[in-house]
Amino acid sequence: MGKIRIGIVGYGNIGRGVEQSIKRNDDMELKAVFTRRDPASVKIQTEGAEVKHFDDMEAMKDEIDVMILCGGSATDLPVIGPKVAASFNTIDSFDTHAKIPEYFANVDKAAKEGKNVSIISVGWDPGMFSLNRLYAESILVQGSTYTFWGKGVSQGHSDAIRRIEGVKNGIQYTVPIEAAVDQVRSGSEPELTTRQKHLRECYVVAEEGADKAAIEEAIKTMPNYFDEYDTTVTFITEEELKKNHSKMPHGGFVIRSG
């Protein structure tokens, strides 16, 4: 049996991470990276793999078994998910929880019409944490499940920040509220709102002359990302961002109490 031939769509942080993971799996090989940028400007780490423009992927339809979609959930995946699923088997980590049913319907329709298989929303959460919840709930059938993310960088929320007009760069940290974690670990099975479980901390580099008040308002009121949380927005320089916020740690807990 030959190796699974992989295509990567999007070459940001996720795409680069997927490339490194493919190298560690002997039954896979990277055939091509697809980008909306000028392919000549994208330097990948895999010898023999090609860099192609997004619009040229159809030409490799018979050379790729699975496309891994590495775009953001805010604006990328809702567009490219169904588009790519019409021609290829796909997998992605779409994580805007409230919009998963809509995204599922759109990708499902395209995949069925193209006679392909698409697996959606199997990243961090939903994904690995979903399996943790399922495993815990199958053991403690009666009880309450709690998920805490962080402290760490949410790549999806960071991507959403960077797409706001006037934002040059930015990063977002998800911070679990310790008092809430302690309540859950006590076994008291508290009823906690979204706002009571996490804080969101945003560090933003604004474009020169940008309206910072408008940027802050756009972040704090963004549906499905920040509007249900207590969110702080701190404006910093590009140099501060590179010096103090260039790493991408993350973590979290799934706790089942019953």
Language model features with spans:
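General beta-strand structural signal in soluble alpha/beta enzymes
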Residues: 92-93, 118-122, 148, 172
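Gly/Ser/Thr-rich loops at beta-strand to alpha-helix junctions
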Residues: 12-14, 74, 97-100, 121-130, ...
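N-terminal glycine-/serine-/threonine-rich beta1-alpha1-beta2 phosphate-ribose binding loop
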Residues: 1-84, 195-197
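Rossmann-fold NAD(P)-binding glycine/threonine-rich loop
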Residues: 94-118
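Oxidoreductase and adenylate-handling cofactor-binding alpha/beta cores
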Residues: 128-144, 159-171
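C-terminal substrate-binding/catalytic lobe of Rossmann-fold NAD(P)-dependent oxidoreductases
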Residues: 5, 24-30, 36-55, 153-258
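A generic structural signal for well-ordered alpha-helical segments
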Residues: 83-84, 107-111, 162
